[in-house]
Each structure stands twice: as structure tokens, then as C-alpha cells.
Regions:
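Active-site cofactor/substrate anionic-group-binding motifs, chiefly glycine-
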Residues: 1-43
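Short coil/turn connectors at secondary-structure junctions
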Residues: 17-20, 48-52, 74-78, 100-103, ...
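A glycine-rich phosphate/pyrophosphate-binding beta-strand-loop-alpha-helix module
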Residues: 36, 40, 44-82
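Short beta-strand segments
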Residues: 57, 80-83, 107-109, 118-121, ...
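Phosphate/diphosphate-binding glycine-rich loops and adjacent basic-rich segments that engage nucleotide
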Residues: 89-157
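Catalytic-core signal marking the mid-to-C-terminal active-site face
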Residues: 186-248
């Protein structure tokens, strides 16, 4: 705010009158404030129509996406959130940065204290991790980035200074990053809320728990398990044994 990058004054005007989508015109404000104001309206619209979307345009300092999708799962709603950002990532097969790290988050209620939630960048690694490698003067693993000439590089400084990160999964990650740029333009965020019961999924909670338990029973690690478990432990909350996030 000191550098006038973020506008501190004014409210969060809502543009449009329909439930899908419902855009917030941010004017360079902090996104968490707008999402806090918009999530109750989004949840109400999703319960009424079965599906609703909140678009926050021209936003800054988004931070993590998981708190927003988790907040919706705590109300019995499924949620999908995405946002583009500044250009840091080259498209698969490309030679220069074009995409943001374009995180994608998803949440689904399971009927207990621990919903299924994930939040990850569509780059092979978060940009902040590259910064840590540079600070520690450590070489990057192969496949994380390219230099300003489009050549593979293990030098964190070369990747950050004129180079680019790479998308995860090659063309698949690149396609998801493209989707995010198309669905959530204007440097904004898109949050979609879903009422599972609106689509005939009356017993969706037990089905969800059974599916996630079947994954864990094979010894596979579910996304965000250890993080959720640590959060539950630190706050004294209980993560049920049937929860997909109860064990690391």
C-alpha cells in the first residue's frame, strides 16, 4: 500500500445480478477481503441453484486457495478455485515464461471434520521453493526450469532472472494452466461452489469416505494429509479415523 500497488480505500462492488457468475470488481485490492465478503453469497447461491461461481477481478496478493475451498466444504459444498498470476512459467515445449504458476484448489465434504482438500501450483514446483534454492545456493533438480535462452537449467538464479519454471506433467500441466488463464482472466480468481445433493448425490458423504478410505487402504498418500493432520493436532481438533486427511 505504501507503493500504491494496492488500493486501500473503497468497498467491493458486485457487478451483475445473476448467480452464475457473480464478479467482484476489485480495483487492485487484496483478494482475501473480497472473498471473505463474497463466500457467503456464493454459498447461498449454490444451495439455491446447485451450482454458483464467484469471480474476483483485478485482484492482488491472493495467497493460498485452500482456505476458501475448505470454508465451503465446511458448509457441505464442493468447491473448485483457480487463479492466474504474473508470468513465471513457460508452456510445455516453449522457451519463455507465459503462464503464472496458476494454482488450482479443490475441496469436497466428507461428512466429518476433515474434508478432502488439495491446493497446488500448475508449475512443477512453487516459485517460492525456487527462491529458497537460490538463497541456499543449491542446484535445482532436473526438469524444474529453463534459463533465458530456453535451455534446461539447474541454476535457481538463471530460472528466476529471465528464465522460466516448467509446468508439471508436461503438456498436461500446461493445459491446466491454460484453462486457468481462460476461466479466470483479468488477473483474478474464480471460485465455483457445488451442492452435491443438487445432482442426486443423496448419500455422497459415505461414498466419498469409502472412496478415499480405499485409496488410503492401498498405502497411497492422499494430498494434504500430513498438513491437515498437523493443523488438527496444533488446534486440538479431531480428525476422524475415516477422514482422508487423518493420517500422513
Amino acid at each position: 500500500m505504501r507503493d500504491a500497488v494496492v488500493e486501500a480505500s473503497g468497498g467491493f462492488p458486485v457487478a451483475g445480478h445473476c448467480a452464475i457468475p457473480k464478479p467482484f470488481r476489485q480495483r487492485r485490492k487484496f483478494t482475501p477481503l473480497a472473498s471473505e465478503r463474497g463466500l457467503p453469497l456464493l454459498a447461498a447461491k449454490a444451495r439455491r441453484y446447485g451450482l454458483a461461481a464467484l469471480a474476483i477481478n483485478n485482484c492482488l496478493h491472493l495467497a493460498a486457495l485452500w482456505p476458501e475451498v475448505e470454508a465451503l466444504t465446511n458448509q457441505g459444498l464442493g468447491a473448485l478455485a483457480m487463479c492466474p498470476s504474473n508470468a513465471y512459467v513457460a508452456p510445455a515445449g516453449g522457451i519463455r515464461k507465459l503462464f503464472g504458476t496458476n494454482p488450482l484448489a479443490f475441496g469436497w465434504p466428507t461428512g466429518d471434520d476433515c474434508p478432502y482438500v488439495f491446493d497446488f501450483a500448475t508449475s512443477v514446483i512453487a516459485r517460492g521453493k525456487i527462491e529458497l534454492y537460490r538463497l541456499d545456493n543449491k542446484p535445482l533438480p532436473d526438469g524444474w526450469g529453463i534459463d533465458r535462452d530456453g535451455q534446461p537449467s539447474n541454476d535457481a538464479a538463471a530460472v528466476l532472472d529471465g528464465g522460466a519454471l516448467l509446468p508439471f506433467g508436461g503438456y498436461k500441466g500446461s493445459a491446466i494452466a491454460t484453462m486457468s488463464e481462460l476461466l479466470a482472466p483479468l488477473h483474478g480468481e474464480l471460485i465455483i461452489a457445488i451442492d452435491p445433493t443438487a445432482f442426486g448425490a443423496v448419500d455422497y458423504e459415505s461414498h466419498s469416505r469409502a472412496l478415499l478410505d480405499a485409496i488410503r487402504d492401498q498405502g497411497a498418500r492422499l494430498l494434504s494429509c500430513s498438513i491437515r493432520s498437523a493443523r488438527c493436532a496444533s488446534t486440538g481438533a479431531t480428525c476422524h479415523a475415516s477422514s482422508p486427511l487423518a493420517a500422513a
